């Protein structure tokens, strides 16, 4: 018998996430937790599962683990991002512009990861991905929450590994002007993903046509680090469908 997990006093039935790119895990979670389906805990956890599906299916992230809890330090999901795979697939279809060997962003000099991929015969160790989910449909992410996210990154990732990790904020809402201005000043690779919440159809959820990745935005630091890796081409051309 599976053990129940309590969050804020509400019991959630855990699931084993085997194939994040499919809807199986989402449907299993919904089915096993019908009795609390009106709670905010259920909605938040459902959104995390939806985000995992999109990270795997649209951005080719893998080894995704949902870790949210009292000791998560603000991180809901961890995983790995094999950018060399994305780069390799994109360059089979379209040419990518050359990138500089070094670039300077906000007073920090860095080497674009594209250069490392080319220097290592198309190989690169996967980036560590730290993901925070904000499953609220009525309010946009505030600058304070972005500052807290940057603090989370700094507390988990040592300076020596800053360019080997990315932190992602996922929300159903568009960025505010204040939030956009703030994230473009920070010296960490931060990506904002606008991912829909699943929509209800009667008593069921439309897992096939909702919960989609709508917007992908890199802050200035991430844009410098990830330039030329083909991520935007990968998304624009829907190469993840192959």
From Swiss-Prot:
Keywords: Mitochondrion
Subcellular locations according to the entry: Mitochondrion
A Pfam short name: RRG7
One GO cellular component, as annotated: mitochondrion
Family statement drawn from the similarity comment of this UniProt entry: Belongs to the RRG7 family.
Stated name of the protein: Required for respiratory growth protein 7, mitochondrial
Organism the protein comes from: Zygosaccharomyces rouxii (strain ATCC 2623 / CBS 732 / NBRC 1130 / NCYC 568 / NRRL Y-229)
